[in-house]
Amino acid sequence: MINQKKNLKRKFGSNGFTLIEILIVVMVLGILAMVIVPQITVSTTDAKNSTLETNLVAMRNAIELYYVEHNSTYPGMTTDAGVAIAASWATASAAPTVKQLTQFTEVNGAVSTTKTATAKYGPYIKGDTFPANPFSATAVATAVKCGDSAIITVVTTDGTTGWMYYPQIGKILANHL
């Protein structure tokens, strides 16, 4: 019986790991995980912040360019047919705003899907929607909600859309909780 154990040792060798060695490796891996995982989380948040800032700058520039090219009228203050609307009606729907910034427009704000002699302005934002808000839920990240105040005193968010737009003053904000 003893000879059989010696034969097995020779056959398979005694190169296995001891329990102490395995515990040391597990502890080292645990320490590395404790250091690396928070760094990944921080860099993800930094990336979202950077994306949000870039998207806000692009949309604010688009809104200001629209304002300059459309006789000092912000997008959403006319219907997509180019008819001026009262400030109270501008908050009812964000559809004209989105169309006016993502399609070609005439000087009065009328929307066209193709560039023509009169619909020569825009599109100011690529695609059919606003860029996604990286902090919003996927289903609402590109949606826009129009605010109902010409003066923003306290910015409140409800998380129902990716963006909050105030057409009376051309202000756009991230709308996330």
Language model: regions and residue ranges:
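N-terminal leader/signal peptides at the extreme start of proteins
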Residues: 1-17
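N-terminal signal-anchor/signal peptide hydrophobic helix marking the start
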Residues: 15-26
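Conserved catalytic core of two-component sensor histidine kinases
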Residues: 26, 53, 60
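C-terminal juxtamembrane segment of a hydrophobic transmembrane alpha-helix
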Residues: 29-47, 67
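Membrane-proximal amphipathic alpha-helices
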Residues: 45-56, 73
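Short, glycine/small-hydrophobic-rich surface segments
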Residues: 63-121
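Short, surface-exposed interaction loops/tails
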Residues: 128-132, 136-177
